[in-house]
């Protein structure tokens, strides 16, 4: 029977099963605290993410449910994988994943990257994106701190809490500004998998230069910086802008010509610059796709078309438009957790869990 132990981390109570020991804080986000730990069952280091107050609002409940569903569905070498999930007696949710030693943000702030590492990291990012996009998922928040790396240079994309369905009417304002695609800033709608390619291009440029390519102070300044390098958006892109205020702002900017990226990236290989040119394109319809980018000459040392898999089936987004109360999201979440642990929802464990005795159910059947 699983026992729960409590520890105070940054003033936050971590309440986890005794399977996990040696808790050490490694990161704090808007929605959760992440600690490293040792899995007593496997002897391996793991990352334990506590989702803060997952059932406090319907929005948070839905966000947590979405992240859980995605982590269960996405199984790929370059995507973080879920090894355990449980709900504590206090009804906090904990995701357990593999632990990687660092992230790309930390690497980039510590030293310049050599060419072969830039190539290998970009290859793995695009390999992961090809799979994610084939599942009908857009990450939406790709940035260096969401790209985890271990001592063998294996790379995994994490944090799918903001991920969304591929939807031509996709709305919202989500990714960290420096890596945000212009169509998100320009229209707040009608964006798709191409936003991740733009973000990957910004990350690629940062690996080449050692600093962010478009470090905007706010979204107005951000867009202005982008046009200084890439020129004024073409008319057909401007025509997609739905907001009158945004349209006025874009038209008020001075006309600018696209600058050759070779002038800015003087030390980069021509193949690297060519791929970057294809990733950082204003018109998302003309932006290179992940599968095409993997076949680009720059990534020839790593490209293997027989080992760049797509998802076997599309992710089921049928829940995403649902406007449900917290209790319903909670029951759906419990059901997913039971499914993850291969517990039959019709047996006693399922009944106890569905009736709210989640901690007891976990203790008896973990």
Swiss-Prot record:
Keyword Transferase tagged: yes
Mechanisms controlling activity: Activated by tyrosine and threonine phosphorylation.
Posttranslational modification: Dually phosphorylated on Thr-171 and Tyr-173, which activates the enzyme.
Modified residues (Phosphothreonine): 171
GO molecular function: ATP binding; MAP kinase activity; protein serine kinase activity
Domain comment, as recorded: The TXY motif contains the threonine and tyrosine residues whose phosphorylation activates the MAP kinases.
UniProt-listed PANTHER family: MITOGEN-ACTIVATED PROTEIN KINASE
Protein name: Mitogen-activated protein kinase hog1
Organism of origin: Neosartorya fischeri (strain ATCC 1020 / DSM 3700 / CBS 544.65 / FGSC A1164 / JCM 1740 / NRRL 181 / WB 181)
Taxonomic lineage: Eukaryota, Fungi, Dikarya, Ascomycota, Pezizomycotina
Chain's gene name: hog1
């Amino acid at each position: 029977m699983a026992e729960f132990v409590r520890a105070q981390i940054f003033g936050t109570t971590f309440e986890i099963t005794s399977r996990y020991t040696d808790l050490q804080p490694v990161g704090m986000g808007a929605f959760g605290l992440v600690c490293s730990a040792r899995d007593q069952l496997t002897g391996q280091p793991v990352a334990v993410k506590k989702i803060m107050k997952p059932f406090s609002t319907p929005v948070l409940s839905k966000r947590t449910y979405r992240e859980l569903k995605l982590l269960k569905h996405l199984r790929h070498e370059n995507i973080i994988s879920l090894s355990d999930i449980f709900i504590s007696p206090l009804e906090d949710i904990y995701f357990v994943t593999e632990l990687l030693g660092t992230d790309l943000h930390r690497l980039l702030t510590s030293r310049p990257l050599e060419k072969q590492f830039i190539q290998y990291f970009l290859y793995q990012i695009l390999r992961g994106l090809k799979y994610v996009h084939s599942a009908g998922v857009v990450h939406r928040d790709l940035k260096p701190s969401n790209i985890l790396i271990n001592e063998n240079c294996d790379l995994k994309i994490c944090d799918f809490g903001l991920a969304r369905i591929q939807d031509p009417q996709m709305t919202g304002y989500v990714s960290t500004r420096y890596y945000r695609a212009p169509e998100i800033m320009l229209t707040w709608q009608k964006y798709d998998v191409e936003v991740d390619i733009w973000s990957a291009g910004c990350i690629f440029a940062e690996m080449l230069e050692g600093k962010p390519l478009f470090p905007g102070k706010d979204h107005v300044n951000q867009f202005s910086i982008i046009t200084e390098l890439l020129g004024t958006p073409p008319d057909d892109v401007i025509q997609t802008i739905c907001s009158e205020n945004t349209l006025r702002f874009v038209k008020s900017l001075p006309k600018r010509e696209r600058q050759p990226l070779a002038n800015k990236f003087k030390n980069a290989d021509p193949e690297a610059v060519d791929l970057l040119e294809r990733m950082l394109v204003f018109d998302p319809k003309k932006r290179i796709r992940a599968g095409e980018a993997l076949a680009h000459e720059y990534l020839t040392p790593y490209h293997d078309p027989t080992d760049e898999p797509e998802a076997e089936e599309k992710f089921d987004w049928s829940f995403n438009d649902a406007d449900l109360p917290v209790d319903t999201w909670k029951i759906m979440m419990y059901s997913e957790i039971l499914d993850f642990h291969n517990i039959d929802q019709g047996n006693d464990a399922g009944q106890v869990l569905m009736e709210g005795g989640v901690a007891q159910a976990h203790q008896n059947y973990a």
